[in-house]
Amino acid sequence: MSKRPSISFSEFEVPQKGVAVVLVAKGGGFADEAAKAVGDAEKIARIADISGFTGALGKTAEAIETTPAGVEKIVLVGVGEPGKLGNDDWLKIGGAAFSQIGNAERVTLTLALPETTIAGDEAADVALGMVLRSYKFDRYKTRKSEENGEPKHAAKITICVADTHSARKAFEVAEAVADGVIQARNLVNEPANILGPVEFAEEAEKLEKLGVKVEVLGEKELKKLGMGALLGVAQGSVRPPRLVVMEWHGAKGKEKPIAFVGKGVVFDTGGISIKPAANMEDMKGDMGGAAAVTGLMRALAGRKAKVNAIGVIGLVENMPDGNAQRPGDIVTSMSGQTIEVINTDAEGRLVLADALHYTNDRFKPRFIINLATLTGAVMVALGQYHAGLFSNDDELADQLYDAGQSTGEKLWRLPLGTEYDKMIDSKFADMKNSAGRYGGSITAAQFLKRFVGETPWAHLDVAGTAMGSPANEYNQSWASGFGVRLLDRLVRDQFES
């Protein structure tokens, strides 16, 4: 696996060896501290001129140059217009900086800009961007550093910033969030022959060491609860299903919890309605929603969030054996509502139907947010830069949208309505699990809405963003961990501010 850098914060100092990284604004402006870090201002101007570097956000320039103090390499990182930087931009700056340090074991980043005060939380976001950029899933590669020129040791990075106390304090929180994102990425990247429902549940149980209460329900308990929708999906696999309930109690008193529910199909062949062979290997990531919920619970516990939160994940494998669910089957969900199975590849909503009802019925939460790699249709509508947002509550939808804007994990709201709801009515049961080609992501959301009652609820369709999304400055991984930072920000803004 990747070597995670060790990051510390310091007052401004002249780097003594290794790599010196400095910030440059659009148009070439830089702080006096940056000039001191590399020896003189002319070096920065010369490197920028030779490289055609303009200081645009996320762009870099580098030179193998020594300084009187012993630095061997200088890296310039563009920040664009300093007055317009947001949280996501500071992550981009950190990720861009990390991308240029190579095999260096000692790095000093001078975090200063002309006529600009960089706050402690902004410095922490830079550090978070570096940690997230350092991530690499290479667990199964037997030849690593000798082939790829990777460093033998993790980089030691010193970030020089004016307010070191605030930066350290903010990074304690950011590092817990990084742990959650990395866990989500690891779970999604893991191959399905290694990570089945049982193994996933075991990973979730490890959160107990952070103070999370974890309960794992097996097939016997699920049958007793009447989870016919979830069990119908699982019956084609020899690997038994699991429902994992994670509880974090961080609020004072007995406040009603907030709840997060994740779809955890550890591998999705499509079942009897089998998928085409091309790219089916990507369906190891069809548990991206469950991975995000697990990563979120780790982040909340790791930073001791002052909130009561519930995470519920339904874990199954969708396989086409002789006992598999068939098109035309009718199953009874835990809610008592019956479902005609039109397409066994519309299985995620069946898993979520029971998980949502269970969560709502048992915990009576303030709201429920579910995440799922639910439909290809949402990718047709939105591509891979936004996840689909559906909600029965405008206030919750607005809060989620704002959290997405501030973290860069962006959402776009799509409609719900009675016209779409009628499309999932069935001739033979209360509803059907697929309404056909048109409005596929919307009718899937309408299906889920039938299992949450009047509770404020939002559904995030992360099919385009949880895996295989375009790389950026702080994520080069196939699995992005999308949703962890977004929902952590929602919790901070709405319950801890």
UniProtKB/Swiss-Prot annotation:
As recorded in Swiss-Prot or TrEMBL, the protein's gene is named pepA
Write down how the cofactor binds this protein. Answer: Binds 2 manganese ions per subunit.
Q: What is its EC number?
A: 3.4.11.1, 3.4.11.10
Which species expresses this protein natively?
Answer: Brucella ovis (strain ATCC 25840 / 63/290 / NCTC 10512)
Q: Which residues bind Mn(2+) 1?
A: 268, 345, 347
Q: Does the keyword Protease apply?
A: yes
Keywords noted in UniProt: Aminopeptidase, Cytoplasm, Hydrolase, Manganese, Metal-binding, Protease
Keyword hit for Signal: no
**What protein does this entry describe?**
Probable cytosol aminopeptidase
Family the UniProt entry places it in: Belongs to the peptidase M17 family.
Taxon lineage: Bacteria, Pseudomonadati, Pseudomonadota, Alphaproteobacteria, Hyphomicrobiales
Q: Where in the cell is it found?
A: Cytoplasm
Q: Show the GO cellular component annotation of the record.
A: cytoplasm
Molecular function in Gene Ontology: manganese ion binding; metalloaminopeptidase activity
Which cofactor does this sequence's record say it needs? Mn(2+)
